[in-house]
From Swiss-Prot:
Pathway: Quinol/quinone metabolism; 1,4-dihydroxy-2-naphthoate biosynthesis; 1,4-dihydroxy-2-naphthoate from chorismate: step 4/7; Quinol/quinone metabolism; menaquinone biosynthesis. Its EC number is 4.2.1.113. The keyword Magnesium applies. Mg(2+) binds at D161, E190, D213. The gene is menC. GO terms for molecular function: magnesium ion binding; O-succinylbenzoate synthase activity. InterPro entries: Enolase-like_C_sf, Enolase-like_N, Enolase_C-like, Mandelate_racemase_C, OSB_synthase_MenC1, OSBS_N. Disulfide bonds: none annotated. It comes from Escherichia coli O127:H6 (strain E2348/69 / EPEC). Belongs to the mandelate racemase/muconate lactonizing enzyme family. MenC type 1 subfamily. Converts 2-succinyl-6-hydroxy-2,4-cyclohexadiene-1-carboxylate (SHCHC) to 2-succinylbenzoate (OSB). This is o-succinylbenzoate synthase.
Length: 320
C-alpha cells in the first residue's frame, strides 16, 4: 500500500547571503515523503533562485502531479531538475539503494573575512581544503586574499568559485596578485569568465586550473579532456535525477577529472543526502557542502555537529 506526504517550508537566511546580485532572505522548498509498507523515503525539492530554471511554485505543481501518478502506480520521473532529484532520492531511500554511509567532511566556505577561515582550518584534521567565493569584490582584492590564505597555511589547497563574474582583464588582475609559487595549490577555479573560451584562455595564461559548473547544464556541453580543466562541480538540485548525477560523475572520472558533489544551499535534510551521495559516488573527494551555517535552522534531519535548532516535520506546512 502506497502513501505520500508533501510539505512546504521556508527557512530564514543569515543577512549576508547574496546570489547573483540578489539578497536571499529565505530558503524556500518542498519535501516529499513516500511510504510503501513499512518503508519510507524522503526527498528535498528546493530550486535555487538565480540558478534553477524553475521556481519553487513551478516545482510544487510538478511534484504534486507526480505524487498523484506515483500513488496510482506510475513511477516515471519528472523532467524538472529539482523535482527529479528530490523524487529520485525519495525513491532510492524507499528502495534502500541510497547508501547510509556519508561524507560529512565539508570544505569550509569563506565568504568574507579570511581570518575566520584561518581559524576554521586550524582545527581541520587531515587534508586542508577550503572554498573561497571570488568575483563579489574587486579582482585585485580577491587575488590578495587568496594569496594571503595560501601564504598563511602552507598545506592548504583552495577551491575558488567566480560564477563567471570576470572579464579576461579582471581574471588577469586577479592572477597578478597570486604568487606563481602558490598557484599549484589552487585546486581549481570554477568558471572564472563569462564564456568557456575566455575561461580556457585564463587557465592557459595563468597556469591556474579551472573547473566547469554552470557549463554542465548547457545544451552544447560535452565531457572532454581539455588542457587546464581539472574538475567538474556537480550540483544535483540543478542537475536532475540520481541516475543523471551518477552518469556525470562517471563521465568525469573516465577522463581523469575530479568530480565534486556540491550544495545548492539545501536544508539539512538535503545536505545529509548529498553527504551520502558524495560518499557513494566520489569517496576520495571532499564535497562542497559547507552551506548550512547560512541558514538559521535545521529541518527534519540533523547535520552532525551543527548547533542550529532543529525544526520537526510537525511544524511544516503539509500540502498533501
Amino acid at each position: 500500500m502506497r502513501s505520500a506526504q508533501v510539505y512546504r517550508w521556508q527557512i530564514p537566511m543569515d543577512a549576508g547571503v547574496v546570489l547573483r546580485d540578489r539578497r536571499l532572505k529565505t530558503r524556500d522548498g518542498l519535501y516529499v515523503c513516500l511510504r510503501e509498507g513499512e518503508r519510507e523515503g524522503w526527498g528535498e525539492i528546493s530550486p535555487l533562485p538565480g540558478f534553477s530554471q524553475e521556481t519553487w511554485e513551478d516545482a510544487q505543481s510538478v511534484l504534486l502531479a507526480w505524487v498523484n501518478n506515483w500513488l496510482a502506480g506510475d513511477c516515471e520521473l519528472p523532467q524538472m531538475p529539482s523535482v527529479a532529484f528530490g523524487v529520485s532520492c525519495a525513491l532510492a531511500e524507499l528502495a534502500e539503494t541510497l547508501p547510509q554511509a556519508a561524507n560529512y567532511r565539508a570544505a569550509p566556505l569563506c565568504n568574507g573575512d579570511p581570518d575566520d577561515l584561518i581559524l576554521k582550518l586550524a582545527d581541520m584534521p587531515g587534508e586542508k581544503v577550503a572554498k573561497v567565493k571570488v568575483g563579489l569584490y574587486e579582482a585585485v582584492r580577491d587575488g590578495m586574499v587568496v594569496n594571503l590564505l595560501l601564504e598563511a597555511i602552507p598545506d592548504l589547497h583552495l577551491r575558488l568559485d567566480a560564477n563567471r563574474a570576470w572579464t579576461p582583464l579582471k581574471g588577469q588582475q586577479f592572477a597578478k596578485y597570486v604568487n606563481l609559487d602558490y598557484r599549484h595549490r589552487i585546486a581549481f577555479l570554477e568558471e572564472p569568465c563569462k564564456t568557456r573560451d575566455d575561461s580556457r584562455a585564463f587557465a592557459r595564461e595563468t597556469g591556474i586550473a579551472i573547473a566547469w559548473d554552470e557549463s554542465l547544464r548547457e545544451p552544447d556541453f560535452a565531457f572532454v579532456a581539455e588542457e587546464g580543466v581539472r574538475a567538474v562541480v556537480i550540483k544535483p538540485t540543478l542537475t536532475g535525477s540520481l541516475d543523471k548525477v551518477r552518469e556525470q560523475v562517471q563521465a568525469a572520472h573516465a577522463l581523469g577529472l575530479t568530480a565534486v558533489i556540491s550544495s545548492s544551499i539545501e536544508s539539512s535534510l538535503g545536505l545529509t543526502q548529498l553527504a551520502r551521495i558524495a560518499a557513494w559516488l566520489t569517496p576520495d573527494t571532499i564535497p562542497g557542502l559547507d552551506t548550512l551555517d547560512l541558514m538559521q535552522a535545521q529541518q527534519v534531519r540533523r547535520w552532525p555537529g551543527s548547533l542550529l535548532p532543529l525544526v520537526d516535520v510537525d511544524a511544516l506546512e503539509q500540502l498533501l
